[in-house]
Design a protein with these regions (language model features):
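Structured alpha/beta reader/binder surfaces that contact nucleic acids or chromatin modification marks
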Residues: 1-134
Length: 134
């Protein structure tokens, strides 16, 4: 397991609501990212621009890291990355905007699926009981 803190950052604030509501549970990244992310790894999910302050949305655990070609993307892959998209063409257009370069069906991508880590509510005393106010 890799040490240190890793981040999955999203550049658009549009994703904040989708992330918080659990509608966005994956990210599709251009290239093979399997050397950076692995199943079971804990990461911070953040939003912000490169070289700028970023907002931590939540901590997450990586459920799956799958390297494949763009042409092998499933509808499920696409919908988990962006609930508004249904077609590979939509995803390709999006990737081209993010990476500022053409993306072909033969390009390698990495689908990273993640689940939010929900923090337990703070106990009042440590024994789970609510303090009485007599």
């Amino acid at each position: 397991m890799r040490g240190g803190t890793y981040v999955l950052n999203f550049y658009s604030a549009v994703f904040v609501d989708q992330l918080k509501r659990g509608r966005k549970t994956a990210t599709i990244r251009l290239g093979d990212k399997s050397n950076k992310y692995e199943r079971g790894q804990v990461v911070w999910i953040t939003v912000g621009f490169r070289h700028s302050p970023r907002q931590k949305i939540f901590a997450a655990v990586i459920d799956e890291v799958e390297v494949k070609k763009v042409s092998e993307l499933s509808r499920r892959d696409i919908e988990h990355d962006n609930p508004e998209f249904r077609r590979v063409e939509d995803e390709v257009n999006f990737l081209e905007q993010i990476y500022s370069r053409p993306v072909s069906a033969d390009d390698v991508i990495t689908v990273i699926r993640f689940s939010q880590i929900v923090e337990p509510p703070e106990s009042h005393f440590g024994n789970g009981e609510t303090p009485s106010h007599n």
